[in-house]
Amino acid sequence: MERRTRNPQSEIRNPQWEGGRVGLGFVRVIAGEFRGRRLKTPVGDRTRPTADRVREAWFSILQRAVRGARVLDLFAGSGALGLEALSRGAATADFVEVHRLALASLKANVKTLKLEDRTTIHRADALEFAERLHPGQYDVAFADPPYAGEQAARLVALFRVNPFARTFSIEHPADQPIPGDDTRRYGDTAVTFIYAP
């Protein structure tokens, strides 16, 4: 698979051009090799990083599954989920993100953690990317789609037809339930887990 961490066509040299900026946010790696490292995130309201407490609970469930795993992070944003997985022992991670500021922060985080050789960054629409995957292509897949819109429902429907990972987990509003094998609620946020048959 082509590595795209340094694709000049999709790289932002100056995020100010996009009417926003990338800064060192309050998102941090929770455990593992990079524990405590802060991650750059886009400044503004276009992305919504997963809260630390939600990620901590999320990974306590997937702790064994991520070790040595091929990981997919859809709607990756700053890459917090995939980078957490790599910190906890995942073998590789593919990140899929379409927004330029989020991509800029993601690329900066991968570079800072020196993870270029274990990551592939795809500038693509997450749903279109997922449609091209093969069954079982990944061990673990994460998704954190925008709360507004139909992306979560469409992605889950796609996974039911084509289970591209052994374990698929998706963040969504707690008041918008998603049918799955297991759902955990954390205040207004929920994470639903779906396992390939």
Where are each of the predicted segments found?
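Class I S-adenosyl-L-methionine-dependent methyltransferase catalytic core
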Residues: E2-P197
